[in-house]
Amino acid sequence: GLPVCGETCFGGTCNTPGCSCETWPVCSRN
């Protein structure tokens, strides 16, 4: 399946592909 977006994002970027930091401080599916 798709990678889970749940890491904390720093600098407005997420390491997981397809994830967004708009829900800072935790990445979510964009």
Swiss-Prot record:
Function comment: Probably participates in a plant defense mechanism.
Similarity-based family: Belongs to the cyclotide family. Moebius subfamily.
Transmembrane segments: none
Domains as described in the record: The presence of a 'disulfide through disulfide knot' structurally defines this protein as a knottin.
Post-translational modification: This is a cyclic peptide.
InterPro entries xref list: Cyclotide, Cyclotide_moebius_CS, Cyclotide_sf
Keywords: Disulfide bond, Knottin, Plant defense
Annotated S-S bridges: C5-C19, C9-C21, C14-C27
Pfam family, any one: Cyclotide
Gene Ontology annotations of biological process type: defense response
Cross-link position per record: Cyclopeptide (Gly-Asn): G1-N30
The protein's name: Varv peptide H
Protein species of origin: Viola arvensis
